[in-house]
Amino acid sequence: LINNLLGAQQAVEYLIQQGHKRIAFIGGREDISTTQERLQGYTQALNKNDLPVDESLIKIGSFKRDSGYFITNELLKLDDSSRPTAVFAANDLLALGVIQAVRESRLSIPKDVAVVGFDDIEFASLPEIQLTTVSQPKYDMGRLAFSTLIELIKGGGYASGRKILLDPVLVVRQTG
């Protein structure tokens, strides 16, 4: 499993280091542990840096691009003193929607609104996107899944309580 908490902390800490104080969180469904863990990492990073957790900047939708787009349009309607200067999206599809909404509003990324996603999907590195994102160690995840499968096939069993967390890495590109 990926350490979602750590990845979210890395993303928000990076935005804080860039000078952002009003950072929005856009997440997927509330009943999914991924959303809960990434939201927890977001709030912990804000608390660690003595920044308030503003509930009006925490938005939950789905993990789809459209959700990021519509939620960002609502956030951008806030007055200048309330509007976020950065958005941490709980996945890259949400972040793509955020980017679309910010660009359509004729705001500059990252000057007016910085955007950080999570997952490092293939589209994140395209020249026209260049999304700053938290990258999951896909190779290590696959290797671990394969070795676990081999262990099961050999009859070695699998410790049902065993939980391995892999650390993500922040990949800084142009949107952050």
Which sequence ranges carry the predicted segments?
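Bacterial carbohydrate/catabolite-sensing allosteric modules
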Residues: 1-176
